[in-house]
Amino acid sequence: MKVSRQQYADLYGPTVGDRVRLGDTELLIEVERDLTTYGEEVKFGGGKVIRDGLGQSSAATRDDANVPDLVITNALILDYWGVIKADVGVKNGRISAIGKAGNPGTQDGVTPGLTIAASTEIVAGEGLVLTAGGVDTHIHFIAPQQCWTALESGVTTMIGGGTGPTAGTSATTCTPGQWHIHRMLESLAGLPLNFGLLGKGNASTQPPLAEQIRAGALGLKLHEDWGTTPAAIHAALSVAEDYDVQVAIHTDTLNESGFVEDAIRAFAGRTIHTFHTEGAGGGHAPDIIRVAGLPNVLPSSTNPTMPFTVNTIHEHLDMLMVCHHLSPRIPEDVHFAESRIRPETIAAEDVLHDLGVFSMMSSDSQAMGRVGEVITRTWQAAHKMKVQRGPLAPDGRADNFRARRYVAKYTINPAIAHGISHEVGSVEVGKLADLVLWSPAFFGAKPSLILKGGLVVAAQMGDANASIPTPQPVYPRPMFAAYGGCPDATCLHFVSQAGLEGGHLPDVGRRYSAVKHTRDIGKKDMQLNAETPDIQVNPETYEVRVNGELVTCEPVDELPLAQKYFLF
């Protein structure tokens, strides 16, 4: 029996050779492999395959290691490692198998770990794109409402610092000291995401920093508003080396304690995560962007400058004034703000992402960044670069390489940078089943279904009083996995190994997981985003050159994944 490609796609989703458009962008992905078996596909529904004795085993029980708790059928997986069609199994909250699901008693080729039984739930992935949950590593914990906004956008892990709408938190991503760290670990345990806290890294001696790591901080944050001097940089990195944690840095915009060359010397070849590496969010003016080419620097962007549009420059001045407690009535404050907002370096940032020089995307939530737009702006930037720069080699009739490069920026690479990639960051066996399902038409804008630890934690849901789930108004709403004790069973708090072993962490009900392998990594470990070119900035014109060639792009006045999808 033969069916047309269109009929097959309608039944089971796209297969090898089919292309899928992502949202209303110009990006197309093509199915590279199909791990399901033609003629033996599993699908749930009336008159379909997953029924007792057909696609569902009559005898297998949950005690069988091959029986998953959940199967996502016929999903199109988009991850840094490829674009494939497969069934995905989840057991005990973790991805247990990727391949072909079904009943080995009646079907050939069922992948070990994907035997569907009476204890197996089904999520219909036909026609949907499956990605890993996003990892946002630049969170100012100003308001708990951020967490719901981030979750409903497809982010499942938040790393940063803060204690609420205080002056320190509104400007800097630090949770200072043991008391604040423990109270925030207790507070965040009530929310259905994974969390990690950055301690305050600004001290020129090591003891005040080390005690925060032992208290459970998963890393340290250096911020210029607290004084990012070469001595503080050296002390923070020295503690990080001792405890195997990451250091994130916002360098000295005013160049008061040194220039970018002094910061590089203080790094001394040690691994460091540079926030908003373009500089509008802060950092040595005008040339902090140079560090993106260093092998020990893990560079990220924050999303308000991404991608470069006709409104980017105008909104940044007011944004900066509010976030850093500046006054438009004080000339020195105005000059400080203007020194950080440079069209030339912002224009270069888009291209450096496309070249794989900038490795990560993040939000800078409510502190010059939008917590619910990390994923959207990543794909807007990818679209803009395809339109302005053309296909990205080796792409041809589809944009698989570009899509894999960009999805890595908010999934696997931030997870690697902060030592949590053994738990989250990709669609791979053994990792937490933090997964996001997208209708292709809404890809990058509005997830259909968000799974946290293998359970649906949020979804597009219609009127609760309707006779079916789909009547308007349809918008993202928390689901059962967001309530009661479920978040404790499906979510993690990431802490230092020293904090975990010290025995002094508060009993918050959820599992702690220690970060690891943050010091033996470098730019080479940033998946598909590991380029280390020579970057130079003209100190008078601010033009950016990469290996001697001018790098720039034009701002755009229209983007996809925007007004068509959102009223506000």
UniProtKB/Swiss-Prot annotation:
Residues 133-568 form the Urease domain. Its EC number is 3.5.1.5. Its main location: cytoplasm. One of its GO terms (cellular component) is cytoplasm. The modification N6-carboxylysine is found at K221. It is found in: Cytoplasm. Substrate binds at H223. The active site is at H324. Transmembrane segments: none annotated. Ni(2+) 1 binds at H138, H140, K221, D364. GO terms for biological process: urea catabolic process. GO terms for molecular function: nickel cation binding; urease activity. Pathway: Nitrogen metabolism; urea degradation; CO(2) and NH(3) from urea (urease route): step 1/1. Belongs to the metallo-dependent hydrolases superfamily. Urease alpha subunit family. This is Urease subunit alpha. It comes from Deinococcus radiodurans (strain ATCC 13939 / DSM 20539 / JCM 16871 / CCUG 27074 / LMG 4051 / NBRC 15346 / NCIMB 9279 / VKM B-1422 / R1).
